[in-house]
Amino acid sequence: MGKGKKGGKRMNKAQLTEILQQFFAERPGETLSFKEIFRSLHLTTHPLKMLAIDIMEEMAWDDYLAKVSDNSYRLNQSVQVMEGKFVRKANGKNSVIPDGEENPIFVSERNSMGALNGDRVEFTFLARRKNHIKEAQVNKILERAKDTFVGRLKVDKDLAYLVTPGDVFAHNIIIPRRKVKGGKTDDKAVVRIIEWPDGENKSPIGEVVDILGQKGDNDVEMNSILAQYGLPYKYPKNVEDAANKISGEITEQDYKEREDFRKVFTCTIDPKDAKDFDDALSIQRLENGNWQVGVHIADVSHYVTEGSIIDKEAVKRATSVYLVDRTIPMLPERLCNFICSLRPNEEKLAYSVIFELNNNAEVKNYRIVHTVIESDRRYKYEEVQELLEANGVIDGTGEPAPAETKEHPYQGENALQLITLDRLAKKLRAARFKNGAVKFDREELHFDIDEKGKPISCYYKRSKDANKLVEEFMLLANRTVAESIGKVKKGKKPKTLPYRIHDNPDPQKLETLREFVVKFGYKMKTEGTKGATARSLNKLMADCEGKPENNLIQMVALRAMMKAKYSVHNIGHFGLAFEYYTHFTSPIRRYPDTMVHRLLTKYAQGGRSANEKHYEELCEHCSDMEQIAQNAERDSIKYKMVEFMGDKLGEEFDAHISGITSYGIYATIDENHCEGMIPMRDIADDYYDFDEKNFCLIGRRHHNKYQLGDAIRIKVAQANLEKKQLDFALAGDSAPIRKEKPEASTSSEKTKKSKQKTRNHRRNK
């Protein structure tokens, strides 16, 4: 590399390239002569000037600069200044996601301007280097994602520090001793930034705003996760006070204005630990032989007035948050668990969709009305499942219970009603999949927790027929409500409504999925109509059901899907194959449902269409908060996973490879489904190359292969609660154990032990 001097310091080509890129990026549209460039950058020596000219030639070749004349350049007009969201990673692989796009652009630490995860930034693309990787440079931080951060305090005599995860700051936060607020070393604390870093090596300055408690305490750790994502871990007293003043009494006027369903069989079906009962189902036989099924939803909007102090807090939260061991409700407890909750043997106000269904579950009629209900029974999913199976239902087959006869009457309290609901739900489900809905039945990780919050067991929970019974009627109600507003005559504009939309899958991601499943011997079509894509996905899900790779394939398939979100601009829902879909059925825990309730009432009374721009902004906020809540939930799962494995260091388990990266192998233990990483630096028998296209690592000398889905034996090496990370090491026969894999997935050789050094990759997922 050429060397030169600037201000008495030697400078190489890479350093001068960065300086020139920054120089031109700050002067878009200006034509700059060599003379101006040399003078502005203090390039005084002949070698340095010649090096600068060579670099500018290369930048022009890369289309970063446009050559105006033999001795002048300007920033290429196509190199526009863009805006996007910055993503910071602990392994230094930072990136920026341009507005309106999904693919991240790499940003090196030196070009990040100290941007934090989630910051909105202005950036430009850099000239491509020899590796041809697209790279960006942050020019300005437009908006900080947040100004408060959570971490562990380290208190010294004169200064204190907040130690944060590597994906937050490149440096720890310095806290003046007088601003520690009584915090001690190893306390978890919330710190507000009072002075942002303005240089590459400068740490931010902060002040403690809340001490959460000592690290390791369960409540402290869960509250730390909430605080990390800016989620509330306390309920404001003034909001609680306002909720306590709300009367749960049903007035004579309420009875007059509502349909009375108190004498119709009604029940709730929920998880065993649920307290907020959003929805209830009623059923009765009509004189014409059809069935009247009521989907009754807690009438939150009756009690929470738009613009009230409770409503403002609900808007801010937008959703309830579900951590492993607790729920952080969107509404105050008095509302969500008592007044609004559809508790058994209590009269409750509801917003209901009443369906008339024939025996094939075809909707013959419906109405959307305010009601008064009284639930006869609070069922747990397990109780309904037990009743169904006791009457001949085989879970997962899609077949209802056999018809009741005098010789074989249905067994169990309210058996006829529940079995009829199940039969109708199964017909609705079959029709939905026939129409092109995508079938994802992924198992969810659950923990059994003791009274101190410590996990004592870890297992996957699968959705059974009882869950699907409730799900189908909720889907039907949500779709019907959306159609009632959105489905209008051609040429007429529908009134504003928040829809739940799900765009078609990204074709490139579908192709990646196709290439992946081929390695397991499966075929998949990625071209054709939406319906053809859905049918191909469903066939794939059916083919891999019950196989060791099932969860893995479902995970990769889900990554090929777009994220569902809220919007007033309806594009339909790909996954459900619904042209119109909204969220109406969970107003206790989702704010969009409350918005829909209010708009339905307004439009039923002849009101004009609501402000589209205002509701789109609310939709965007709710979508963002939903994602944040999901991230917090995942972090709580990771924490409990590490805590659960903490006393199993050195133990060996059978596992499957669930992720392959350039810095290591992710593996999921078969027995308890906990996931950890085997760092690349610890696979010391060879130098491994990451084959991203084929989802595998291949050794250069011995050609051993580690591939997604492979069976391996691991040993628990480390459980880091602070980072929420498990480290594994290969154990026993450390090469993948291949069992009856197709030819496309070749067998590995046994791993040969050696001391050859390998890359030292920092970890992140």
Labelled PLM ranges:
Residues 1-14, 687-696, 731-765:
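Acidic, low-complexity intrinsically disordered tails
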Residues 2-294, 301-347, 378, 385-386, ...:
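Charge-lined substrate channels and their catalytic hotspots, especially those that engage the 3′ end
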Residues 39, 190, 195-197, 214, ...:
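Electropositive polyanion-binding surfaces
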Residues 64, 120, 188, 362, ...:
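Residue-level marker of beta-strand positions
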Residues 103-108, 169-175, 673-690, 738-740:
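A short macromolecule-binding patch
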Residues 119, 679-722, 726, 738-754:
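Intrinsically disordered, low-complexity linker and terminal regions at domain boundaries
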Residues 126, 194, 658, 717-719:
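Short, surface-exposed secondary-structure boundary micro-motifs
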Residues 151, 201, 717-731:
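Internal insertion modules embedded within essential enzymes
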